[in-house]
Amino acid sequence: MSASTSTSTAASQDACYISLLGLAEYFRTSQPPNIKKCIQCLQALFTFMPPSKVEARTHLQMGQILMAYTKNIDLARQHLEKAWSISEPLPNFDVKFDTASLLAQLHLQTDRNSHQAKAMLRRAVELSQNNVYWHCKLLLQLSQIHASDREYSLASELLAVGAESADEASATYLKVLFLLSRAMILMIERKTNDVLALLNSAGQIIDNNIPNPHQKEYLKVFFLVLQVCYYLALGQVKTVKPSLKQLQMSIQTIMAPNWPSDEAIFGANQLEMFVWLPKEQLYVLVYLVTVSHSMMAGYMDKAQKYTEKALTQIEKLKQQEDKPILSVFKVILLEHIVMCRMVMGNRELAIREIAAARDVCMAAPQRSLLRRHSAQLHCLIGLYSMSTNLFEHAERQFVVCVSETSERDLKLFANLNLAIIYLRTKRDTDLKQILDAVSTENTHTYSSQALMGGFYYVQGLHAFHKNSFHEAKRFLRETLKMANAEDLNRLTSCSLVLLSHVFLSIGNSKESMNMVTPAMQLASKIPDIHVQLWGSAILKDLHRMSKDVQHEKDAYANHVKYSENLIADQRKCVQSAHHELVNWFQGDPPVTSGPPAAPVLLMPESSVTASVPVIASTSAAMQPAGQYGQFY
């Protein structure tokens, strides 16, 4: 064959490839898309015996189309595996990296474990060292999988490698993304000092080395979210306020109508085409951390208001595109609002919203959300059972929670509630055992003001029940010191009302009144019906002792009102179909029918796909409440 004939044949083949690809794209983008004909066009390419690179790319495109538009996962896998086998040995050919990334996603969808996905990505990371964009993208994807599997050390190491690679390529924006992502992983591991060092380092780079003002503001939001979560994890509700205010201002800037689209900000340079979360999802996340702060500070009305706004925003985004991260946000928000309802005495609403959280978890593919949130659901049902005086059910729920979770704060929270159950049911041996265990495990290692304050509160409650009033005062003053330092209002109100009861028990009516008065003021601001019930009983006794008949009548009337509200709510609880959830101890939670959660929360308003995980989702606001010292 002559050279001219060969050239003519090649040109003719190229024209066929281009025509078939154009036709395939035409069918794909038709309204509605004609995927069958699109696939037939791509399939026809193989009849021309195309060169290796064209063949590999076509197999990749077939895999992409099949994954995106059909349920034929097996055929998609075959095409992607073929694309990988052809492209892997070819140098300077990016198709291998795109294929590896997609194959890893497919393995995660279909396999019971993530071994194959990790192996595929490790090989691709190894091959991509001369391609900074793909090297960093694959490192992020692999670290995400390790983080999802709770292999945090491996995830952290990969993110450190990514930061170095970005630094060597002078990709400052990308380097900061890696640093902040790693800080998030270290936060989950509770490596407090390392988190602080990384945040300080990233903060300085954001302030001094990011020339693009839009990218700078975006990174600032990421940085401030982590900083707020860092302080909240330490229970530092007062300390966090300036950072939270700054975060709220930054997100308003990003959400302004004149702010450029994410595509415009991150589309110019390949090494800047990385986004932690789109701005619409960041907006929801800022609501979420604001809810968490309001709960910990003891502002239930604020927490409810922001939860309603966040859930409305989630429903809007779900109508556009139902991203998995939105379900994660929804579950966390529901976990918060459930605790909020119980503090306010709305337990029937709480069990409805526990059922709503269950439904969101059950709807996620492969029960992935249920696996991650099962322990939290058991804990919430334990709190609900406690509040309805089902102590045996509550105990079993907390025991399941402790056995299922590896999160130290959730374990401590459940154990403190178990301690209160043992206290209320007079099981002194079990109580001593659990308090000793909590003390040994947490006193020197756990640094959350809220939870350690709660631990001292439980010890104070224990001392009070033993009539060791001096010891009770010592523990409760320690609790008050911690609560007042960080404006933990619920912890303060609970400690004050218990201290008031201590002073009443030893006949010191003046000090008792000095404690119960601010306790009731705080409880009405929160509002916390349990502290109000307890405080009104103490006030009734104090006014009776001082022969103040009118105030005694007023206090008694208030006590009756709070009591009747709780009794009426209790009746609604036991009549609710969702009440059956108290009997769920293993496996999938039962399906229960009943009224949905409050419409104002879940109806749309008339109103990752992140590179790294947003798993800093500990349900905060775990503080004591209730006449008998219940925690929420």
Curated annotation (Swiss-Prot):
Function: Required for association of the cohesin complex with chromatin during interphase. Plays a role in sister chromatid cohesion and normal progression through prometaphase.
GO biological process: cell division; chromosome segregation; maintenance of mitotic sister chromatid cohesion
Record-stated family: Belongs to the SCC4/mau-2 family.
Any single GO CC term annotated in Swiss-Prot or TrEMBL for this entry: chromatin
The organism of origin for this protein: Drosophila erecta
Alphabetized Pfam families for the sequence: Cohesin_load
Chief localization: nucleus
Compartments it resides in: Nucleus, Nucleoplasm
Residues in coiled coil: none
Name the record gives this protein: MAU2 chromatid cohesion factor homolog
Keywords recorded for this protein, A-Z: Cell cycle, Cell division, Chromosome partition, Mitosis, Nucleus, Repeat, TPR repeat
Residue spans of the TPR repeats: 453-486, 493-526
Keyword Mitochondrion: no
Subunit annotation: Interacts with Nipped-B to form the cohesin loading complex.
